[in-house]
Amino acid sequence: RTAQMKDEFAKRNTKVLALSVDDVASHEGWAPDIGEVGGTELNFPIIADPDKKVAELYDMIHPGEGDTSTVRSVFIIDPANKVRLTLTYPKSVGRNFDELLRVVGALQLTDSAPVATPADWTQGEKVIVSPGMSTEDAKERFGADKVEEVKPYLRWTDDPS
């Protein structure tokens, strides 16, 4: 599904990179299957980590599954090379790429404006004014008619993106 969502990741200026404990020959063997099964070609790099150095460094080896089985880990790393999000799924549970796009959008938004995103937020929905910003400053920044004060610590405003 990642390959199918290439344009969505590109819209967010986000690059995808995969890691597998399989070797390059193994990747070359199953990469064509992605096109056949998923209807798109593999369009992002996959790191071969057969010695498991990277997988072990990032705790991607499931302790109960043997040393050849990685858990489904996702890391969102920002342009400053700071890990902003880590998600680890059990081997039996697939990842939710719509959620990953939502998180990338939320991180980019909250990096660019003094806001926070509420639970289940999606782009275009109202956001929470940062608790560190006064209501007066929020009204000046976002517009007096755009800030709704529910409580002194809970103020809503339109998505500024």
Pin down the residues of each PLM region.
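Chalcogenol-based redox active-site neighborhoods
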Residues: R1-S161
